Amino acid sequence: MNETEIFFQSTPWFIFLISYLIGSIPFGLLFTKLAKLGDIRTIGSGNIGATNVLRTGNKKVAALTLLCDMLKGAIVVFVIKFFSDPLNKSILISLAGFFAFLGHLFPVWLKFKGGKGVATYLGVCLGVYWPAAIIFIIVWSAIFLLMHYSSLSALVAVTITPIFVFYFSDTYFCCMLIAMSLFVFIKHSANISRLLIGEENKIGTQNRDK
């Protein structure tokens, strides 16, 4: 019996449910309401992520949203790292991070209409293999400084990061990142269309967002 078979026969699946529920906490929505900035779903693009929160003009709330959305992915992974069985730890960590990511994209509390997953993606990278998070940040920052498009920066970053992981980390994490990257692209389909016709907004504008 190989490692994968042992994992699927012994893993307590409630771990993935908890990971999903943690990932589904809509920090952007909660923080904007607590700060009396309105319902973020009716502002800008309607997205609950940090970039759209920035459109409220409150940088502190946007930064807090970014941090907490990252921590959703990172904390789940860190906890699994310390408490899981070494035999199937690699698979368990990757899947727990993936379910936290899915929770952010499809939160049960908001009728499965969540964010686009970029911050949580970064958090999962930080928790699983921190060099991948560094690569993500470097790529995102470089593209943003050159082009000033948050969406394009994210799309390039989630393309490069799995390639880096393929060469320097394990197979399970790489497969999980590829799946997450595909979801990020799907969630950014409208942004991609606008980028192709030159109508995508740069960060800091007041219309649509990522």
Swiss-Prot record:
Catalyzes the transfer of an acyl group from acyl-phosphate (acyl-PO(4)) to glycerol-3-phosphate (G3P) to form lysophosphatidic acid (LPA). This enzyme utilizes acyl-phosphate as fatty acyl donor, but not acyl-CoA or acyl-ACP. Disulfide bonds: none annotated. Its EC number is 2.3.1.275. The chain crosses the membrane at residues 11-31, 63-83, 90-110, 126-146, 163-183. One of its GO terms (molecular function) is acyl-phosphate glycerol-3-phosphate acyltransferase activity. It is found in: Cell inner membrane. This is Glycerol-3-phosphate acyltransferase. It comes from Bartonella tribocorum (strain CIP 105476 / IBS 506).
